[in-house]
C-alpha cells in the first residue's frame, strides 16, 4: 500500500512547525536528494547528513528563524508525492525570502528515500550574496 495525502501532510508538519528533526526522522540516512539549480544550495546529496549540511545548516546561518516552510498543496500517487511548499522568511539583512518550491518525493515503506527539489535559484543566490557565510 502506498502513502496517503494525510500521511505526507503529517510528515511535513515538522517543517511547518520549525521542527526539522521531526521531519528528518522520516528521511532515510542514505537518501538521494537533488536540489536543482545554479545557486549555493544546489547539488546532489547522497545522505541525510550531507543534505542537511549542504542546505539547512547554511540556511540557518542567514535565516535566523529558519526557512519557515509551509505546504501549499500536494499530489500523491502510490509511493510518490509532489509537494508544493512556500517559504516566507526574513534574512539577517532584512531581505524577505519569499520562495516557492516543488519537491518530488519518493517513499519506501513510509520513509523518504529520494527527492528532487525545484526552487527559485535567483532568490537563493540573492539571499547568499546579501548575507555571506563563512
Language-model segments: what does each one mean?
Residues 3, 57-134:
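A beta-strand edge to alpha-helix "cap/lid" segment located at domain peripheries
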Residues 3, 18, 46:
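Residue-level signal for the nucleotide or nucleotide-sugar donor/cofactor binding architecture
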Residues 18-34:
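Short, well-ordered alpha-helical segments enriched in acidic and aromatic residues
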Residues 29-77:
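A solvent-exposed, acidic/Ser-Thr-rich amphipathic alpha-helical stretch
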Amino acid at each position: 500500500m502506498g502513502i496517503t495525502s494525510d500521511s505526507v501532510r503529517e510528515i511535513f508538519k515538522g517543517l511547518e512547525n520549525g521542527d526539522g528533526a521531526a521531519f528528518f526522522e522520516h528521511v532515510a540516512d542514505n537518501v538521494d536528494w537533488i536540489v536543482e539549480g545554479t545557486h549555493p544550495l544546489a547539488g546532489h546529496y547522497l545522505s541525510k547528513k550531507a543534505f542537511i549540511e549542504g542546505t539547512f545548516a547554511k540556511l540557518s546561518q542567514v535565516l535566523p528563524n529558519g526557512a519557515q516552510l509551509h505546504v501549499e498543496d500536494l499530489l500523491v500517487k502510490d509511493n510518490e508525492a509532489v509537494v508544493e511548499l512556500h517559504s516566507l522568511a526574513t534574512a539577517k539583512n532584512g531581505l524577505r525570502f519569499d520562495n516557492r518550491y516543488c519537491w518530488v518525493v519518493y517513499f519506501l515503506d513510509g520513509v523518504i528515500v529520494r527527492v528532487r527539489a525545484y526552487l527559485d535559484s535567483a532568490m537563493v543566490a540573492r539571499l547568499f550574496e546579501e548575507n555571506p557565510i563563512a
